[in-house]
């Protein structure tokens, strides 16, 4: 019976399934992919890691008590950002859930990747066109040309027809 193949979720987002497991995490071509699906997976992994850390800090230290009796060592905090928990007073009903959430608020700082929209991803992919296509695009040669192209593209205002009339009237009044 063949070994079960590893399914990388980042590759699966892009239609590639059954990647070989050994060394794939370091070699995954979508490891730093900015698309929204990959960003969601990365955020989910980060949140899972935070959840594991919370469970680990909330578990009683049963394994360490036996070793700490044999060799006394000074206690050191697990992390400088872990605040002390307030004592939990049991209540009934919906308040129990709210109190458990509010009493377990801990300060964890985790940098999550930015999620980009599909439109932004398409624009990024257009920018990754081959060099020949990018050379065909006209680039402004001066600041004035760049400003002119911006003004031309700016006609997406909802008042563009009124603005065009105002520009037309001012041009005819100058003549």
UniProtKB/Swiss-Prot annotation:
InterPro entries: DM_DNA-bd, DM_DNA-bd_sf. This is DM domain-containing protein mab-23. It is found in: Nucleus. Residues 58-93 are annotated as: Disordered. It comes from Caenorhabditis elegans. Probable transcription factor that plays a role in the development of the dopaminergic neurons of the male-specific genital sensilla (simple sense organs) known as rays, by negatively regulating the activity of the transcription factor ast-1. Involved in male mating behavior, probably as a result of a role in the differentiation of male-specific diagonal muscles. Required for development of the male proctodeum. May be dispensable in hermaphrodites. GO terms for molecular function: metal ion binding; sequence-specific DNA binding. Disruption phenotype: RNAi-mediated knockdown causes defects in patterning of the dopaminergic neurons of the male-specific genital sensilla (simple sense organs) known as rays. Males are unable to sire progeny due to abnormal tail and gonad morphology, whereas hermaphrodites have no obvious phenotypic defects. Expressed in a limited number of non-sex-specific tissues in males, including 6-8 unidentified neurons of the head, ventral body wall muscle, and the PHCL/R neurons. Residues 59-71 have a biased composition (Polar residues). The gene is mab-23. PROSITE patterns: DM_2.
